[in-house]
Amino acid sequence: MDPPTRPSVSGPRTRARPPPPEALPTVGFEEEVYDCLDYYYLRDFPASGAGRSKGRTRREQQLRTNYPVPGGHERKVAQILLNGQRKRRQRQLQPRPRTRLA
């Protein structure tokens, strides 16, 4: 019986041939030059400086913005009223100081 033959390790290896150029899909100039990230940066980031946008995209700016309230400074007015009520309550709880004139 003959021993089983092994393939030679040092022999030449065959490489897969690339497909002919006709079989490759044709791509336009923009698809060839730009990839997905390039389109992302071109579309979403504003043209102004980095300090103005805080590094956010336009979409993030629209989602996380403080919309102007048509009533004006409502929070400020409400805080002033609450502070006044708190002061009134504190004055009522404290006894009035005695003076010599009264």
UniProtKB/Swiss-Prot annotation:
Which parts pass through the membrane?
Answer: none
Source domain of life is: Eukaryota
Name the gene: Nupr2
- What is the recorded name of this protein? Nuclear protein 2
Organism, by scientific name, is Mus musculus (Mouse)
**Function, as annotated:** Acts as a transcriptional repressor by inhibiting gene expression at the NUPR1 promoter in a p53/TP53-dependent manner in cancer cells. Involved in the G1 cell cycle arrest, and in a decrease in cell viability and cell proliferation of pancreatic cancer cells. Plays a role as a negative regulator of the protumoral factor NUPR1.
Pfam families in the cross-refs: Phospho_p8
- Record's subcellular location: Nucleus
The ranges of region (Disordered) come to 1-26, 46-102
Q: Name one GO cellular component term.
A: nucleus
InterPro entries per record: NUPR1-like
Q: Could you tell me the Gene Ontology terms of the biological process aspect for this record?
A: cellular response to starvation; DNA damage response; negative regulation of cell population proliferation; negative regulation of transcription by RNA polymerase II; regulation of cell cycle
Q: Say which family it is in.
A: Belongs to the NUPR family.
Keywords attached to this entry: Cell cycle, Growth arrest, Nucleus, Repressor, Transcription, Transcription regulation
Q: Where is there biased composition of kind Basic residues?
A: 85-102
